[in-house]
Amino acid sequence: MADIFDYISRRGDLTFEQDGFNELDALVISRLSYLPFDGSVSSCLFDEITLEQAAMRVFATDDYEKNLLWKGDADLLKATAESKRFGKILVSGYVNEVESDVSMQFSAITFEFLKKNYFISYRGTDNSLVGWQEDFNMFFTFPLPSQKKALDYFEKAVRLLNGKFILGGHSKGGNLAVYAGAFTDENSRNHIDYIYNFDGPGFSLDKIRDSGFYEVDDRIYTFVPQSSIFGMMFEHEESYTIVKSNQKGFLQHDIYSWEIEQNSLVRLKSTTNFSVFFDHTLKEFVESLTIAQRREFTKEVFALLSLTETATFNEMLKNPLKNTGTILKSFAGLDSKTRNMLLKTIFAFVKSAKNNFSDITGGQKSIEITT
């Protein structure tokens, strides 16, 4: 079961002039945006350094490991930086912003892999409470603050760099890439070669119909694993490709579990019952709530989480008993109207899950979650 590390090992000795850009390169660079380049890569698009130099700076930082979002990220940075293919890529324009007052988490970085050929990589959701709250806000807010930032970042890059662009990202980062391509002006859109969305949510149809989506949809490449959850949220008007993960359920969101063959991801014909079940359940649940109810539920849930006085889920999990106790105590202390609203909403989700479980399994007691 080969993965992207095998790809880097096998093809890392070939430059982009020797072997052209492909979907695995897009996957690798999309993941690199999760690395903590703070203080290592300039926010200025003209202040470029090589990925090799950027990696040396990151690894020289004493506390870089605590800022890693996934255990494979440090290995990915090391492998790419040491390779001929990725190590000499020029990186610049690193932005990493978290604004709790508007529930926004946004990060992006630009890679120049060939002269005047750029890949803008948008980071997906990190482990901050703010980042996750923004994801929940997607069900009642459009556009999100991070979507606006993604568009501004791209249009600024076009004005300053005036080259050819590939936009891409994993998870929310993929959604940001598609948003930037769909909602930009015609001139900027003409600079786009491709857009890559790796297991990122789609959009409500009524939103994209008011955009330039259909002017760029033939350049969008969307990939989801067979039991995709996040990537199947909302609608994908563009066609999408189902790829094989060696993990199960939610863990398939991890791109390090995606299997490759030569220069491509391994294709499958369909998603699993698990993915269909969760997709139908979530859609039914969301549609059962008004916009106001969605907003109120999200507000109260994250208000409870904020009482733990932690900024990230990692911090919260360092003292699970204390923080769980804080949340439960705070929940019990809520006024009856708010408490009943939260319980009613949770029960609505359980009801949707029960209905869809029966519909999809045909009365069976289990559903398949792997292929």
Task: For each feature predicted by the language model, list its residue ranges.
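Gly/Ala-rich beta-loop-alpha elbow adjacent to hydrolase catalytic centers
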Residues: 168-173, 177
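Short glycine-enriched nucleophile-adjacent loop
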Residues: 177-186
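Alpha/beta hydrolase fold serine-hydrolase catalytic domain that processes acyl esters and thioesters
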Residues: 1-24, 28-118, 122-152, 156-164, ...
